[in-house]
Amino acid sequence: MAVNYETKATNTGGRNGHVQTDDKAIDVAIVPPAQADAEKGTNPEQLFAAGYASCFNGAFDLILKQNKVRGAEPEVTLTVRLEDDPEAESPKLSVSIDAKVKNVLSQEEAEKYLQDAHEFCPYSKATRGNIEVDLNVAVVD
């Protein structure tokens, strides 16, 4: 299988440490979720939310363009939750994907294209069957 892209990140210190990508595009302090703020650092959940939101919106935009939908201007907000797992000793993740598109298409079309994006998105593929994912889309003015 051909590799289209590869990147590396190295962490020291776990959730009280530091992470840096090999190209230094990301070079940040890592702190536990309760301590995260712009001055102290970020956490793995924020990084996951940022990556998944960006990847998913790219997939959604591509699906819209493939279906000749113009002017939809998709926006995706991804919420990552770190929650107790009653079946395990460690916590688990769940996510909500909340998308908005301009009213150049119907709610039914927006939901179909959102689902198509979920099938296409590499992050969605990687998490499928592993975490709960809620999909929501709103058609706005």
Swiss-Prot record:
Disulfide bonds: none
Region: Disordered, residue numbers: 1-20
InterPro entries: KH_dom-like_a/b, OHR, OsmC/Ohr_fam, OsmC/Ohrsf
Gene3D superfamilies, per the entry: 2.20.25.10, 3.30.300.20
SUPFAM superfamilies: OsmC-like (SSF82784)
GO process annotations (BP): response to oxidative stress
Pfam families registered for this protein in UniProt: OsmC
Coiled-coil ranges (or none): none
Family note: Belongs to the OsmC/Ohr family.
Record-given protein name: Organic hydroperoxide resistance protein-like 1
Organism, as annotated: Staphylococcus saprophyticus subsp. saprophyticus (strain ATCC 15305 / DSM 20229 / NCIMB 8711 / NCTC 7292 / S-41)
